[in-house]
Regions:
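A residue-level marker of the well-folded mature domains of exported/periplasmic proteins
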Residues: 22-327
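Gram-negative bacterial Sec-dependent N-terminal signal peptides
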Residues: 1-23
Length: 327
């Protein structure tokens, strides 16, 4: 009898050990869910996700809705939860709107990490390339220098519910009021819906409404190319300053023509890689602390504020150095 018991215990132990080896060998499934698919910004982010998969062996992939619609993104997150991934990395159109579905993901045992959502509650961590207020101040200082610190300017956001875009603009306007009193923001924030054609049309409308306008600040990666096209059509290169977030791949022609003065950005590929790496760290039970090096450019000495991880990852690009960034 004792022999049988010992044999049974040994068999159970062997089974548990074998099971642990299988679990350890099973790669994590991490699905990155972006605001929308098919635009340069998130195409570049997908390169980072694929690089993470190649480097680590994780089953890492990226999905996005065909257009920037909050309800479509929520449904996509719902569909993704049903696939039972190990983790999801979400770049939300509206952090507030996705809170309930992210809560559902966490309740289902799915690790949640976000980007561009510093107010998020239902995630283990949110990853930001930099402190949004610092970036907004930087954009305003650049715009003000170009405008000679005086005159009217207009601001654009991809969405009025995009926390990141609004934080940039709010910080920029606060900086203007504090340091550049001869400058004036005209109208309210213009919403491009992350659509270059909409940004173009609204820029033309702003130019008609405010003929003395001297500057634009864009937030979505599709704002400045849309604005730049409007500037070219009106032959206003060199007369109106255009600054904002963008990528060389869809702004270089306007940088070269002078329709856009400068773009600033962080590499979305590195952000995508960072989200996936942090998700795996959470899966492994690891904690992030201020001063940690994630081993990713711009995230070599992060700052942790609550659950928000901040890097120092922005770069400025003009026509002089655009060729250095082939994406």
């Amino acid at each position: 009898m004792k022999t049988k018991i010992k044999a049974t215990v040994a068999l159970l132990g062997a089974t548990m050990i074998a099971s642990s080896f299988v679990n350890a060998a099973t790669p994590s499934t991490i699905i990155t869910i972006v605001k929308l698919s098919g635009i340069a910004w998130f195409d570049r982010m997908e390169q980072g996700v694929k690089r993470y998969a190649k480097d680590t062996g994780a089953a890492a992939s990226q999905v996005g809705a065909a257009k920037g619609d909050v309800q479509l993104q929520i449904q996509l997150i719902e569909d993704t939860i049903a696939k039972k991934p190990t983790a999801i990395a979400v770049v939300p159109l509206s952090p507030e709107a996705v809170e309930p579905v992210l809560k559902k993901a966490a309740a289902a045992g799915v690790v949640v990490v976000t980007h561009e959502a510093s107010s998020i509650q239902n995630a283990s961590y949110d990853i930001e390339a930099f402190k949004n207020a610092d970036y907004g101040v930087h954009l305003m200082d650049s715009l003000a220098k170009c405008m000679g610190e005086e005159g009217q300017y207009a601001t654009f956001v991809g969405s009025l519910t995009s926390k990141t875009h609004n934080e940039w603009v709010d910080a920029a306007v606060a900086r203007q009021k504090e340091k550049y009193p001869k400058m004036e923001m005209v109208g309210s924030k213009n919403e491009s819906t992350d659509n270059e054609a909409v940004a173009h049309d609204k820029a033309l409308e702003v130019l008609r409404t405010y003929p003395k306008l001297k500057g634009f600040q864009g937030s979505s990666s599709l704002d400045v190319p849309g604005i730049g096209r409007a500037i070219e059509e009106r032959s206003l290169q060199g007369k109106i300053c255009v600054f904002g977030t963008g990528l060389p791949s869809n702004t270089k022609q306007y940088l070269d023509s002078g329709a856009i003065n400068q773009i600033s950005f962080w590499d979305p590929a590195d952000a995508g890689y960072a989200m996936n790496k942090v998700a795996q760290m959470v899966i492994d039970g690891k904690k992030i602390a201020t001063g940690d090096d994630l081993g990713i450019p711009g995230y070599n000495k992060v700052t942790l504020d609550g659950k928000v991880i901040y890097g120092q990852a922005w770069v400025d690009v003009t026509k002089e150095n655009a060729a250095k960034y082939p994406f």
